[in-house]
A protein has these predicted regions:
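Shared catalytic-loop signature of beta/alpha-barrel
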Residues: 79, 86, 95-212
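Metal-dependent enolase-superfamily TIM-barrel catalytic cores that perform enediolate-based chemistry
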Residues: 1-108
Length: 212
């Protein structure tokens, strides 16, 4: 992880996102108990610490929890990672169904919070924004229904001075759609992509994307 992170930085990126809790892949008992073993937890801490040591203090490290954890586990993980490695956000700390649980998490964590890839309309995001449940939102241009709805979500977030970071899990077209939105809203933050998939992305395009 540390070596891969250094390569990302050397390629020109200023932010790295990862899920360090390998025990939860592929999703383990996510919707059953939401917990992680002490061994798996410590492995996650060690991975993020190694990445931080490798890339230094000027690179943002973002953590994606994939909604895998229950409330006390998410609070514990996010606070430890923020205190030890100064993470830039803890994303999807809980399954997305309960805004009340998200509020409880928000009140107990020190880390910045990012949510939104599994919220689908501006009305979903309105509740998050009105109740100060996140520092960043991550709408998905595919799952929100397209560029028009995502632009409306971005404009709504702008009223609350909340940055947006378009979620990307669908490939080259989604990256280009997210970039299109990012060029037209003032509260654009980062555009997600996976370095392992770049070759595959470019096979769908007439002109390759320069990701730096």
């Amino acid at each position: 992880y540390a070596k891969a992170a250094r390569k990302v930085v050397n390629d020109g990126h200023d932010t790295i996102k990862l899920d360090p809790f390998l025990e939860m892949i592929p999703y383990h008992t996510t919707y059953i108990d939401g917990r992680i073993s002490k061994k798996g937890e410590n492995q996650g801490y060690d991975i993020v610490s190694a990445v931080r040591e490798s890339v230094g203090d000027d690179i943002d490290i973002l953590i994606d929890a994939h909604g895998n954890f229950d409330l006390p586990t998410s609070v514990r993980l996010s606070n430890r990672l923020y205190e030890d490695s100064n993470i830039g956000w803890f994303e999807e700390p809980l399954p997305p169904e309960s805004f009340q649980a998200l509020e409880n998490f928000r009140n107990q964590t020190f880390s910045p919070v990012c949510v939104g890839e599994r919220l689908f309309t501006r009305w979903d995001f309105q509740h998050v924004l009105e109740n100060n449940l996140a520092d960043y939102i991550m709408p998905d241009v595919t799952w929100t229904g397209g560029i028009s709805e995502m632009r409306k979500i971005a404009n709504l977030a702008e009223l609350y001075y909340i940055p947006i970071s378009p979620h990307n899990a669908q490939g080259a077209g989604q990256i280009l759609a997210g970039a299109h939105i990012g060029m037209h809203v003032p509260n654009f933050y980062k555009l997600e992509h996976c370095i392992a998939f770049i070759t595959g992305y470019n096979e769908f395009l007439k002109e390759p994307i320069n990701f730096v």
